[in-house]
Amino acid sequence: MSQENSNVPALKRTESKYKIGRVKSLPTVQIDEKTGDSYIELAPRSEGKIYGCTTFQGNYKEEEKLGQGTFGEVYKGLHLQTQRKVAMKRIIVNQENDLFPITAQREITILKRLNHKNIIKLLEMVYDFPPESNNKDYAQFNQNNSANPPAVPKKFFYMILPYMVADLSGILHNPRIELKMADIKNMMKQILEGVNFIHCSKFMHRDIKTANLLIDHNGVLKLADFGLARQYYGSPPNIKFPGSAGSGAKYTSVVVTRWYRAPELVLGDKYYTTAVDIWGVGCVFAEFFEKKPILQGKTDIDQGHVIFKLMGTPDERTWELAKYLPGAELTKTEYKSTIDERFGKHLTPTGLSFLKGLLALDPYKRLTAMSAMKHPFFQEEPLAADRLTLPCEESHEADIKRYKEELHEAMSQKGPSAPPGHIKEATPSPAKFEKKSGIKREQPYQSNQKNDQYPIKRQKFNQNPSVPHPQPKANRYGGSSLPSGPKYGRYEGNNHSGSLRNRITPSNMGTHSNPRAENMGSKPYQSEGRYSSNEDRKNGYNRGYSSSVNSRYNNRAAFNETEDQSITTTTLNRYRHKGYHDNNQSQTRLQGHSSLPGKPTSKYNSTQTNIPYRRTEIPNPNEYNASKLGSQDTKKNDYPKHSETQKQQNNEEKKIHSEQKDIADLY
């Protein structure tokens, strides 16, 4: 009785606590006729759903397409319930009968097992139609029974990942983002922490590069794209040695993007270690300073030569086992290391030692992630920033093309400019000129009229426009008396050749007007006539300046009769081009011109074209007549002697003339 009574309450408690529902029928076990193995056949889930996957409808909304490549499309989306931005990565299945890709299977499995702040997190899997596809057209076809049915949409697998505002590749190519050494150290520490966690979890990433290093809006860096990652079976890494491949384990050597591929992979080693990821970290660290991949090989063989050009050809000291690898032929070409010259200007000796440790040729001498985090490089100033702060602008790898187009457009609209402050120091503004002498200088011309093509002050040449301009005096050959041609400098407005018969002689020298200035309403000015006697040399007239300089000067600084005419006239006469006349040849020759017949009558040799300027009292040029200009009574050495003060004034006036010439060239 006691036993029966004790069992009754127990049954009541069981009935009240547990509810028996509908029992699921077990699938029928079948036996394979060929192999004899037993198996069960699973029926597909209703509505085409996959276990562990959700759909876009009611859960996610696509916003824009971020990019497209060999991996497929990546969309920027929004989780409707939490309003959280996500990235939706499509997994490619090339053919209808293909199985689920092994790379995607590895990536999903590894991301489910890794949980670290510096590793991207897999939020969810989606199995649905592409976001941009429209299923309404296909539904209407079934209702209307149209003759031309639309293409049946295909479902794909999508990985739902957190949306990251930037990747390291986009940041390095963004011209508006400038990274400091404290920011670089902050990102390097985050990269090494993530890589160390992956290696200690007995995985190898095998695709470390700037495009796979993502950064969120809080400045947290995360490693992404584990499509090439895999598990290794050897011992995990420590402070000295990397994680080993394991006994008898052989891996494929065609991994890692070529420009970030370690030398042991280039030489065909299939028993590599976790050190292949450390080489990629070193390439990323060096890329901070050159803003581009540092080892850009065109082929797999060329990649080996590029590596050895930077680090030097391996020998018994740097990499003893390199000669036993399948691609050891590459090590026969002798190269010297250039890493010191290439990166020594960017890094301190400690930073250069850190880079060499990451890029050591021997994988067993290469730094591990654990030892790299303890390197003295992170203890010296400046220390790593506590938090990475970046501009609000999003920067992805897909934006690099846009950055290059913006730079090309800016360069096409803007001409090449000198460095800041260069133009200001070389050609200062005329208003800021230091007044070195009593000579009055003209101000630069600023016109509001569109037709003005030359910087000339109109009021300086013609204060009364009603006065007609005299025509230039014609010489006996019917042309202008102004000489031209490559031998005698540049004379605007003269179309005659530079023959000897068109040169100015004392008989045809007079007052002429510049045709270019005449078209602009300018006032006639005195010609570029050359004084041609030895007496002129005695009086100190300078013949060394080229005719083009005098033409530009007279166009810009012709004297103004309403102002101080004595100063302006003296200024003009000082900078006029002077020549001399040889009565024996009855022709005027330029001083020192070796191509003309006859010998120069001065003491300067034929190769000297610029005669030093000599200052003396200059009389009014209108007082010179032909007889005075043609006289040759003065001896060669009868030059006036000048004091040191006069020589100093001459040098100052030379500088002023050079400055005025530079201003004329600018306009």
From Swiss-Prot:
PROSITE patterns per record: PROTEIN_KINASE_ATP (PS00107), PROTEIN_KINASE_DOM (PS50011), PROTEIN_KINASE_ST (PS00108)
Catalytic-site annotation from UniProt: 207
Region of interest: Disordered: 408-667
Top-rank taxon, per record: Eukaryota
GO CC, alphabetical: cyclin-dependent protein kinase holoenzyme complex; nucleus
Binding site for ATP: 66-74, 89
Residues in Protein kinase domain copies: 60-378
Residue ranges with Low complexity bias: 541-556
MF GO annotations: ATP binding; cyclin-dependent protein serine/threonine kinase activity; protein serine kinase activity; RNA polymerase II CTD heptapeptide repeat kinase activity
Main location: nucleus
Keywords: ATP-binding, Kinase, Nucleotide-binding, Nucleus, Serine/threonine-protein kinase, Transferase
Gene Ontology process terms (BP): positive regulation of transcription elongation by RNA polymerase II; transcription elongation by RNA polymerase II
Compartments (UniProt record): Nucleus
Record's catalysed reaction(s): L-seryl-[protein] + ATP = O-phospho-L-seryl-[protein] + ADP + H(+); L-threonyl-[protein] + ATP = O-phospho-L-threonyl-[protein] + ADP + H(+); [DNA-directed RNA polymerase] + ATP = phospho-[DNA-directed RNA polymerase] + ADP + H(+)
Bias-annotated ranges (Polar residues): 494-516, 582-594, 602-611, 622-632
Known role: Serine/threonine-protein kinase involved in transcription regulation. Phosphorylates the UBC2/RAD6 ubiquitin-conjugating enzyme (E2), leading to monoubiquitination of histone H2B and the silencing of telomeric-associated genes. Also required for histone H3 methylation. Necessary for the recovery from pheromone-induced growth arrest in the cell cycle G1 phase.
Family to which this protein belongs: Belongs to the protein kinase superfamily. CMGC Ser/Thr protein kinase family. CDC2/CDKX subfamily.
UniProt protein name: Serine/threonine-protein kinase BUR1
Organism of origin: Candida glabrata (strain ATCC 2001 / BCRC 20586 / JCM 3761 / NBRC 0622 / NRRL Y-65 / CBS 138) (Yeast)
Taxonomy of the source species: Eukaryota, Fungi, Dikarya, Ascomycota, Saccharomycotina
Gene behind this protein: BUR1
